[in-house]
């Protein structure tokens, strides 16, 4: 989760609207990309083509998705909600 200091720094670095990529890592379950897209669509509707890559041992998958972010609040909300998905272990 972002802290107040990192929020201020992130806000200063970004000029909205901007392209923003989320990388979501979770258990290698077939529903992972669908769950990620469901959260993204709630806050940034669009036509997305996420990239899914397996880990070396195949236990985890990473889902990368690029959105057009419109505000720092949207970025923070997506980090929070993507991290709340049960099978997700990390959001970058």
Curated annotation (Swiss-Prot):
Q: Under which name does UniProt file this protein?
A: UPF0250 protein VIBHAR_01213
Organism the protein comes from: Vibrio campbellii (strain ATCC BAA-1116)
What does the organism's lineage look like at the top?
Bacteria, Pseudomonadati, Pseudomonadota, Gammaproteobacteria, Vibrionales
Looking up HAMAP family in the UniProt record yields: UPF0250
| Top-level taxon | Bacteria
GO CC list: cytosol
The UniProt similarity line reads: Belongs to the UPF0250 family.
**Family annotation (InterPro entries):** UPF0250_YbeD-like (IPR007454), YbeD-like_sf (IPR027471)
């Amino acid at each position: 989760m972002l802290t107040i200091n990192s929020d201020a720094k992130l806000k200063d670095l970004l000029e909205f609207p901007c392209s923003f990529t989320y990388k979501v890592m979770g258990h290698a379950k077939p529903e992972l990309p669908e769950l990620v897209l469901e959260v993204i669509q709630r806050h940034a509707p669009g036509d997305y083509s996420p990239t899914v890559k397996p880990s070396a041992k195949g236990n985890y998958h990473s889902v990368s998705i690029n959105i057009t972010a419109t505000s720092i609040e949207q970025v923070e909300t997506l980090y929070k909600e993507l991290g709340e998905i049960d099978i997700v272990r990390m959001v970058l």
